[in-house]
Amino acid sequence: MPRTSGGHLGPDPGGLLSAPCGTVAGMSKAEGTFDIDRFDTQDPHDDRDGVKLARAHITKTFHGDLAGTSETDIITVHTENPAAYVGIERFDGTLRGRKGGFVLQHEAGGTDGVPWMTWKIVETSGTGDLAGIRGEGQIIIGADGGHSYTLDYEL
């Protein structure tokens, strides 16, 4: 994935801008933004035949319905285009005033030239007031490089 000078994913990280996601019936919707505080990449650990596999560690600060911090570990695959990644993120903070945490499973890539970035709450990973949380959503990277999120969830 391309990196900007700040070390984070740019406005179009290898063609990974996400597609719109609607609210799932019976679920609440959380929305907001997040800042990437650190984006530490490692050199590719597998680089052959035009395909590179690499790892990165990311720390974030969330604003909006989710307020708190997270740590994420991802494995990326770099090809001509689109790039892709999978990852695990642990969030700690509040969701609309409820204190706790949960783990998100990330997946991103492209299908027929249409990029997407999704995340899903790992079942039974909720803690504190967020125990029992379930849901899924998406990450959106704006044209200005800003990051926002949506999360359809139920408690």
PLM feature spans:
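Beta-strand-enriched cores of mature, soluble protein domains
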Residues: 20-155
